[in-house]
Amino acid sequence: MAKKSMVAREKKREALVAKYAAKRAELKEIINNKELEMEERFRASLKLAKLPRNSSAVRLHNRCQLTGRPHAYYRKLKISRIALRDLGSSGQIPGMVKSSW
């Protein structure tokens, strides 16, 4: 299990990303618009820099929904390889059987 504080920190980051996503997208669109004046684009980049650091989606890290483990994460299932193995062994994932050859 991951530390509770790390899982809580990640949830807080997810909330910040969701809160500022629209504002970030709007500012990035202004910055990347070559038709606007350079001064206006520069002001937009300063506003973007003033937003909270944790509101950037790049700072998010995928974590297992069951254990909070940050490594060996399967995106489709949203769980780690260890949680997948445990669930598969106990028969809680339909169609998953232990392989033998």
From Swiss-Prot:
Disulfide bonds: none annotated. This is Small ribosomal subunit protein uS14. Gene3D superfamilies: 1.10.287.1480. One of its GO terms (molecular function) is structural constituent of ribosome. It holds the Pfam family Ribosomal_S14. GO terms for biological process: translation. Binds 16S rRNA, required for the assembly of 30S particles and may also be responsible for determining the conformation of the 16S rRNA at the A site. Belongs to the universal ribosomal protein uS14 family. HAMAP family: Ribosomal_uS14_1 (MF_00537). GO terms for cellular component: cytoplasm; small ribosomal subunit. Part of the 30S ribosomal subunit. Contacts proteins S3 and S10. The gene is rpsN. The keyword Protease does not apply. Transmembrane segments: none annotated. The lineage of its organism: Bacteria, Pseudomonadati, Pseudomonadota, Alphaproteobacteria, Rhodobacterales. SUPFAM superfamilies: Glucocorticoid receptor-like (DNA-binding domain). Keywords: Ribonucleoprotein, Ribosomal protein, RNA-binding, rRNA-binding.
